[in-house]
UniProtKB/Swiss-Prot annotation:
This is Zona pellucida sperm-binding protein 3. Pfam families: Zona_pellucida (PF00100), ZP-N (PF23344). The ZP domain is involved in the polymerization of the ZP proteins to form the zona pellucida. The chain crosses the membrane at residues 384-404. Residues 1-22 form the signal peptide. Residues 43-305 form the ZP domain. It comes from Felis catus (Cat). The keyword Heme does not apply. Polymers of ZP2 and ZP3 organized into long filaments cross-linked by ZP1 homodimers. Interacts with ZP1 and ZP2. InterPro entries: ZP-C (IPR055355), ZP-C_dom (IPR042235), ZP-N (IPR055356), ZP_chr (IPR048290), ZP_dom (IPR001507), ZP_dom_CS (IPR017977). Residues 405-424 are cytoplasmic.
Length: 424
């Protein structure tokens, strides 16, 4: 009876209440749960980028092959890993693998991507995974250190980064006296001041400070030619100002990436050519770097008989008197002649590199009137006075002749009256 009563109750509640039959659970082994840890882990280190990629990249349980993974536009390969390893590891320098860099107001941003590009295995022509690209980015504060080491993080890869991201453009131009515009005519009177402006166009780079490392004047665009006259030497000493010239760097700068200076014009003795070319070696450093003996702009001030820098500690110019600045302890011209010379640039031509040798010219000298008078030529003023004197003498002579002829004609035409005496 009890058994029949129980079966009757189950029949009434048969709609699936589970009162009589416990619910059954089935485990879906086809779609496992997603992994709890991320499949791509990026470490932005001081000068390195480390990327760890899970072989279960898509979380489906189907493992990717390390050979199908590359980093960056240059397709850098991962480190060698064993078959039992769960991850694939990349370790590259920040400026390698075609990584791009961008400078913002507060950060230096390196960007790249992880590429999964599956290829058929063996003789098969099918793929079981899709192509995928994962963007990767590392941000470094510009005004703080990213590690415990006392090294500026943005400067370690600076040179390579600069060349790969956007090259610098250097220029050297002749300017008007007010520095407001470029000089339209290259002509000068001897003794005039030539206003020169060196500049670098930095684009989106770290703020830079430009220096004129060396300048030389020659009769041709070849700065190794003879004769020559050194204007700037010893890594930024304007040595032309030591003579009777007033050549000097302009302080303060208008901008860190611009450096202006004046040079008293001159010509080479015992040479009939009235023109010169000026070639300068330009270079840059980070604007945050304090100027030193190798990176400076020093002028000699005759009133105090001392060297003064445009910026930085005053003692960085002391080496200008010794003629030995930096480790080499020799003239930049002499050390530069020891290696092949770079290609020359014509006037206003811009170079694209981290340093550049720029030539401006020719500067043509017309000379002064007083100089020509000393050399024995007749000045225009003297010629005019002589001409006026000759004209006056000629005019007086002609007037005398005309008056004489007129008087003679008048005398010939007058009737003669002779006195008659009466005889008685």
């Amino acid at each position: 009876m009890g058994l029949s009563y129980g079966l009757f109750i189950c029949f009434l509640l048969w709609a699936g209440t589970g009162l009589c039959y416990p619910p059954t659970t089935t485990e879906d082994k086809t779609h496992p749960s997603l992994p709890s840890s991320p499949s791509v882990v990026v470490e932005c280190r001081h000068a390195w980028l480390v990327v760890n990629v899970s072989k279960n990249l898509f979380g489906t349980g189907r493992l990717v092959r390390p050979a199908d993974l590359t980093l960056g536009p240059e397709n850098c390969e991962p480190l060698i890993s064993g078959d039992s390893d769960d991850t694939v590891r990349f370790e590259v320098e920040l400026h390698k693998c075609g990584n791009s860099v961008q400078v913002t107001e507060d950060a230096l941003v390196y960007s790249t991507f992880l590429l999964h590009n599956p290829r058929p295995m063996g003789n098969l022509s099918i793929l079981r995974t899709n192509r995928a690209e994962v963007p990767i980015e590392c941000r470094y504060p510009r005004h703080s250190n990213v590690s415990s080491e006392a090294i500026l993080p943005t400067w370690v890869p600076f040179r390579t980064t600069m060349l790969s991201e956007e090259k610098l453009a250097f220029s050297l131009r002749l300017m008007e006296e007010d520095w407001g515009s470029e000089k339209q005519s290259p002509t000068f009177q001897l003794g005039d001041l030539a206003h020169l402006q060196a500049e670098v166009h930095t684009g989106r780079h770290i703020p830079l400070r430009l220096f004129v490392d060396y300048c030389v004047a020659t009769l041709t665009p070849d700065q190794n030619a003879s004769p020559h006259h050194t204007i700037v030497d010893f890594h930024g000493c304007l040595v032309d100002g030591l003579s009777d010239a007033s050549s000097a760097f302009k302080a303060p700068r208008p901008r860190p990436e611009t450096l202006q200076f004046t040079v008293d014009t001159f010509h080479f003795a015992n040479d009939p050519r009235n023109m010169i070319y000026i070639t300068c070696h330009l270079k840059v450093t980070p604007a945050s770097r304090v100027p030193d003996q190798l990176n400076k702009a020093c002028s000699f001030i005759k009133s105090s008989n001392r060297w003064f820098p445009v910026e930085g500690p005053a003692d960085i110019c002391n080496c200008c008197n010794k003629g030995s600045c930096g480790l080499q302890g020799r003239s930049w011209r002499l050390s530069h002649l020891d290696r092949p010379w770079h290609k020359m640039a014509s006037r206003n031509r811009r170079h694209v590199t981290e340093e550049a040798d720029i030539t401006v010219g020719p500067l043509i000298f017309l000379g002064k009137a007083a100089d020509r008078g000393v050399e024995g030529s007749t000045s225009p003023h003297t010629s005019v006075m002589v001409g006026i004197g000759l004209a006056t003498v000629l005019s007086l002579t002609l007037a005398t002749i005309v008056l004489g002829l007129a008087r003679r004609h008048h005398t010939a035409s007058r009737p003669m009256i002779c006195p008659v005496s009466a005889s008685q």
